[in-house]
Every structure is written in structure tokens, then in C-alpha cells.
């Protein structure tokens, strides 16, 4: 395995993120530099990408590369895009435009590749026992990826088109305001239906539910803001219910000031928390463990084998 430094860029629906890292021989990732840009390329007005998606993504990539040079003079950039580009009619042409602007090729990941790389990254977290049966999920703006695996290998994956941006756009009338009881009830029923259709009557047995993505980070910070107990990176099922009610029945300003939700996520966090809560309920998971190791870590590991 090479020790070459890799700048992994993940163009998501709601944010664009990077990791400058190096794959270690033991399967872990040495993190050198990370950054997140709140650049939403997925439109809140209609399905698809915002008109300036290529310019937003190209600017972020260039800024990431410039910052990475402060840490490493030699690195290779690998950029990927997920469901926002995968589902957009102009996804490939937008990826081509990004290359024409900044010179970095963007690979649009299929559902299986996104799930596989995300799971690979999560299992590189030394705090997670990858030998045990594990369910991993990553909730983004465009989709929910759920992976069942054991022994560090993916066994089964599901990609559900219920990302927080998509669901908010479709079902919440004014996402900056507090939800009505009817809106929350609708979200609850909608996600129950989605989970039932996805998993059916039986769910494979597992030991640990592991979650990644901005929505889980937001839940972790909100849990801390409320002073809820337990491990710092562990959220119980009951705590997730408390967090869901907390962010739904207040406006976006309170979500930011009282519950530590980042400004770029205050409009979509009710849908995100409702999705996580419904997933935990369907799986029968008493808790979830958050990991910062994710798709970008998997991308560094994959690139390190090339």
C-alpha cells in the first residue's frame, strides 16, 4: 500500500468536504487536514442542481487544494459526487464543467460504490469493532445509505432517496419555521413507510449501529447542548426522540442558538432527525455510534491501493 497523500473531495447535496490523508498498512487512515464548505448544490426549489453548481464545486476544490499545499507539497486529488449528481439530468455535464473550470475530474458514484466506500471508511475507525456484524448509515442531503456488513466487508447495501434536502423540499412548507404537529406526524408516517418498504418484516441481526454524515454530527452537538448523558459519540434511541421533538417545535434561529445546529443545516435538520429516528426504530437499535470516518476515508484507502 502506497504512502502517497490523497486529497479526497466529496461533493454532496448540502456540503462539499475534503480530507487530505494517507492510507496506513494496517487499514487505518492518517488524517492530515479536513474541511467542510456549506455549499449546497442541490436545489431547494426544484429537483436537480442549482444553476451555479459547477462553479460552487470548482471553487471549493481549488480552495481545498490551495489549503492542502500548506500541509503537503505532493498529493493527488480524487473528487467524487453522490446522489445530487447521480439523480440530476445534468449531473454528468455539470461534472464535465467542473473539470473544465478547475482541471479536476469528478467521478459520479453509483449507489453500490458510494455505500462500499462509506462502509470501508467507517470501518477504519479504530473505536469500532469491524469484526462484529455492523449496520452503517450515512444520511446526506440526497439519499440515505444503509450498509450491513461483518468482518470489515460489506454484505448488503440499500440506497434510499430520502435525503434531508429532498424530503424537506417535498414535504415541509416553511422549513425555517417550527413544524406543525401535522407536519411531524406526516414525516413520521412517511419514514415508517419508507423503512417498511426497504427492509420488510425482518432485519438481519447486528451488534452495532454506526452513523456518519452531517445529520449525525448535528444530533451529537444537539445532545451535548441539551446536556443529555452517555458517551460523547453515542446517542440512544430515547435521546434521538428528544432531539427530534426539540428541533421540530422551534424555528431555525432557536435550532442554531439553543441546539447548536450549524446555520447551513437549520432548515433540514427536522427531516434529518425524523429519518434517523425512524431508521433506529425499524432496526430495533437501542443506540447509534457516531464516526467521523466516512466516504472520504474510504476514498483515501481505495486510492492508496492504486
Regions picked out by a protein language model, each given a short descriptive name:
Residues 39-66, 70, 84-94, 100-133, ...:
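Helical "lid/coupling" subdomains associated with nucleotide-phosphate turnover
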Residues 16-20, 144-148, 298-299:
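Short beta-strand scaffold segments in enzyme catalytic cores
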Residues 27-38, 72:
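N-terminal glycine-rich anion-binding loops that anchor highly charged ligand groups
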Residues 2-30:
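N-terminal basic/disordered segments at the start of proteins
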Residues 6-10, 134-138, 209:
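Short glycine-aspartate micro-motif
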Residues 15-17, 143, 216, 287:
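Structural motif
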Residues 135-143, 147:
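A generic, well-ordered mixed alpha/beta core segment in the N-terminal half of proteins
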Amino acid at each position: 500500500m502506497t504512502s502517497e497523500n490523497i486529497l479526497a473531495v466529496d461533493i454532496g447535496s448540502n456540503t462539499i468536504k475534503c480530507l487530505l490523508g494517507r492510507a496506513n498498512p494496517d487499514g487505518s487512515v492518517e488524517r492530515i487536514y479536513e474541511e467542510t464548505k456549506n455549499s449546497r448544490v442541490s436545489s431547494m426549489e426544484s429537483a436537480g442542481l442549482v444553476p451555479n453548481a459547477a462553479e460552487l464545486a470548482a471553487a471549493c476544490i481549488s480552495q481545498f487544494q490551495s489549503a492542502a499545499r500548506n500541509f503537503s507539497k505532493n498529493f493527488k486529488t480524487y473528487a467524487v459526487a453522490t446522489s445530487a449528481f447521480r439523480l440530476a439530468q445534468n449531473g454528468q455535464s455539470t461534472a464535465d464543467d467542473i473539470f473544465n473550470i478547475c482541471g479536476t475530474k469528478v467521478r459520479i458514484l453509483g449507489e453500490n460504490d458510494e455505500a462500499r466506500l462509506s462502509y470501508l471508511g467507517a470501518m477504519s475507525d479504530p473505536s469500532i469493532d469491524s469484526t462484529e456484524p455492523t449496520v452503517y448509515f450515512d444520511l446526506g442531503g440526497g439519499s440515505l445509505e444503509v450498509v450491513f456488513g461483518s468482518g470489515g466487508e460489506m454484505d448488503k447495501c440499500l440506497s434510499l432517496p430520502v435525503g434531508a434536502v429532498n424530503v424537506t423540499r417535498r414535504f415541509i412548507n416553511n422549513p425555517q419555521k417550527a413544524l406543525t404537529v401535522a407536519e411531524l406526524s406526516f414525516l413520521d408516517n412517511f419514514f415508517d413507510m419508507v423503512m417498511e418498504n426497504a427492509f420488510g418484516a425482518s432485519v438481519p441481526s447486528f451488534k452495532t449501529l454506526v452513523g456518519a454524515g452531517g445529520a449525525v454530527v448535528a444530533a451529537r452537538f444537539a445532545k451535548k447542548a441539551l446536556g443529555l448523558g452517555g458517551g460523547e459519540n453515542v446517542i440512544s434511541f430515547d435521546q434521538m426522540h428528544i432531539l427530534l421533538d426539540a428541533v421540530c417545535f422551534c424555528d431555525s434561529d432557536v435550532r442554531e442558538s439553543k441546539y447548536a445546529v450549524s446555520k447551513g443545516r437549520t432548515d433540514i435538520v427536522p427531516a434529518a432527525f425524523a429519518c434517523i429516528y425512524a431508521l433506529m426504530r425499524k432496526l430495533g437499535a437501542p443506540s447509534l455510534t457516531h464516526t467521523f470516518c466516512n466516504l472520504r476515508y474510504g476514498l483515501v484507502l481505495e486510492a492508496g491501493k492504486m
